Each structure stands twice: as structure tokens, then as C-alpha cells.
């Protein structure tokens, strides 16, 4: 195996590749603002273990999405990633019509700008959801739970 092949194989095994839950963790930190948080509390609020949150922050730091302290998001890098990279790294997966939590243009603030028919709703499948619509797989399984507990994160 050549040098490039070894580098690619090494990168594939690296523990530093972003995972979907890493984006959830960074977004939760962003909406926390100046509020102090602990790994345990953050994990409980978004449905992850303390260990998962810790590993997510290490990967986010390695990717440049949080600062060296792993306490503050790098807003510029995060915005660039969300706008230009997320759809390629974690493409949306559509599913059947179901009951769930509104997402995309079906949720504020986009629902105020994008006019759509009541039957043209996108939802994350969620048993406690109150909207019926086309299902969209959430970035991570605990996203609907986390969004239902934190309206700011849901936006």
C-alpha cells in the first residue's frame, strides 16, 4: 500500500472523524450561550451519556467546531459547516408519513418565511409529536427528544 493509501486507511480508523451526535453537542453548547454547563447536564439534556459528550467535544475540537477549551463553539466554522458541509457528510433521509416533531420549513423560524400547505409538513418521527407529515431521519436518534426539551435548540 502506498503512502496515500496508508494515509486514507489511517484517517478512516481515526477516532477524530465527526459523528452526527457531535453536531448535536456543538449546537446545544451554542444555544447554552453564556450559561455554565457540565458534561453530565449537557448529556442529560440531549439524551447522550457523559462519555459520549466528552468524545463528541474531542472530535469537534479536532474538526475546529469548538475552541481549544472545548467550551465555546467556533461560530464561523460551525456556520460554514452547517451551510456548506452538513448535507454532504450527513445527507437527509426521507421516510414514510408519520406523527412527529416539526422540522425544516415546518418549524419556526422558517415556517414564517416559507409558506407551505398543511399537508406538506416535514417531521422527525417522535411518539410525543403533534404533527403528521413526511418523516425525515434526524441527525441522531436523540435529536427529537432534545429538541422537544429545548425550543431554542429546536429552532
Segments from the language model and where they lie:
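Short, cationic-aromatic polyanion-contact patches
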Residues: 15-22, 38, 68-100
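Short alpha-helical segments that sit at the start of domains
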Residues: 2-32
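Generic structural signal for hydrophobic core residues of well-folded globular domains
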Residues: 28-33, 60, 146
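Long, low-complexity, charge-rich intrinsically disordered regions
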Residues: 1-6, 96-155
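Short acidic, hydrophobic short linear motifs in intrinsically disordered regions
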Residues: 34-46
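Helix-turn-helix DNA-binding helix
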Residues: 53-54
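A short, conserved structural fragment
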Residues: 48, 59-72
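Non-transmembrane "mature" sequence context
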Residues: 40, 57, 66, 135-140
Amino acid at each position: 500500500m502506498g503512502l496515500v493509501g496508508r494515509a486514507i486507511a489511517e484517517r478512516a480508523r481515526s477516532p477524530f472523524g465527526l459523528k452526527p451526535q457531535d453536531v448535536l453537542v456543538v449546537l446545544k453548547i451554542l444555544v447554552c450561550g453564556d450559561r455554565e454547563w457540565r458534561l453530565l447536564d449537557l448529556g442529560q439534556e440531549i439524551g447522550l451519556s457523559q462519555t459520549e459528550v466528552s468524545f463528541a467535544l474531542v472530535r469537534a475540537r479536532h474538526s475546529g467546531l469548538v475552541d481549544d477549551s472545548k467550551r465555546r463553539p467556533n461560530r464561523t466554522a460551525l456556520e460554514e459547516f452547517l451551510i456548506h458541509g452538513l448535507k454532504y457528510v450527513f445527507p437527509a433521509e426521507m421516510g414514510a408519513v408519520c406523527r412527529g416533531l416539526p422540522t425544516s420549513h415546518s418549524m419556526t423560524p422558517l415556517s414564517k418565511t416559507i409558506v407551505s400547505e398543511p399537508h406538506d409538513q416535514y417531521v422527525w418521527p417522535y411518539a410525543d409529536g403533534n404533527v403528521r407529515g413526511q418523516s425525515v431521519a434526524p441527525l441522531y436518534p436523540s435529536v427529537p427528544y432534545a429538541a422537544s426539551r429545548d425550543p431554542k435548540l429546536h429552532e
